[in-house]
């Protein structure tokens, strides 16, 4: 199988733990187990007693029921635990959805900027991938009239990230509904990477709230400060494809670890604690960035971010990859280039 190099991982992974200043990571400050127990008011002795008695056999094949209940609670009442499939991380979720839905003869519409899996995997499977790019001219919003020109009766999937990686732009309720209506007109699935969803004082809509063929992917990595659990999930409103996703997941990871799922369940049952903590952390960081930008005429933000990422423009005549490499070499500062 031939597939494009996963560019962001090839850039970040060798440097992530070496940089003095890591601005390339978008995970909200990770918690320790002790911090997690304290934040969630979990009895430490009882937790470790439960952990000590836990079997190290395979875990639950669709996910720990307690965890699935907590995941469903991240959405409106239209989402039920039955619609949840627990998988290995957000990357596992994205891969499983793509491998499940992409079939010969399908075309895929990918809304950029986007996570590379969403267009490189379909391309590697031989699908026609039609790219729609949100850019500075549109303030990184979707022009649905233009997007509709890429969609036809052979479009199997429209995929995107909301909040976006890296701009931080998030579709509002009206935009989610417009996207659902466009997909509905041709019977296409919508797959939305929602891993940054939740860093807001207001409820952020999910594609699964508004569309019967909506699928969303996420994990505990970013908003919930626990990438090390490697717990991710897929929510699918269309239960007719869940079995196919489970079959594909069996080729990847069989199931998740029960210890990891227990920790993730506790975290997600206390989602508001993590939303509040990490929204405050991100807002403080955004305030620092805004203040810094006041004295930097060569830099400007693309849009106001609703995630833990920020996408900046500069007007220097230097390729972004060269700029990022020189910044790391000279200042031990890690950023991701666009």
Residue ranges, per PLM feature:
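Structural signature of PLP-dependent enzymes
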Residues: 242-249, 267-290
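Active-site phosphate-binding strand-loop segment of PLP-dependent enzymes
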Residues: 136-201
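A short helix->loop->beta-strand "cap" motif at the edges of active sites that frequently abuts
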Residues: 106, 127, 185-188, 212
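Conserved C-terminal alpha-helix-loop-beta "cap" of PLP-dependent enzymes
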Residues: 312-338
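N-terminal small-domain helix-loop-helix segment of the aminotransferase-like
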Residues: 2-89, 269
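Conserved PLP-anchoring active-site segment centered on the Schiff-base-forming lysine
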Residues: 82, 100-122
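Active-site PLP attachment segment
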Residues: 210-244, 256
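Conserved glycine-rich beta-strand-loop-beta hairpin in the small C-terminal domain of fold type I
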Residues: 265, 281-290, 300-314
